[in-house]
Amino acid sequence: MKIYNYMEDTVRDTLDSLLSKRKDICKCQKCKLDMMTWALNRLPPKYIVTDKGRMYTKLKEQEIQSRADVVREVTRAISYISSKPQH
């Protein structure tokens, strides 16, 4: 078994959703990875080991404050990285 930070999935899904609504922002792999990294460094990790842990984490992710925190940090990441792309 491996240890996995489930927050990566949550941030990736949120980023994809928010970027799909924006036509004015670079969506290259470098920018997307920079945005993910920026947001992940500001959010608490959610480590899991088993599929049961994955399901529990998925349920916890649905809590309103947790979801709001992810959306807030991903939105900030998009704003910050898109204003200073590294390419």
Residue ranges and their predicted role:
Residues 1-87:
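Charged, amphipathic alpha-helical regulatory modules used
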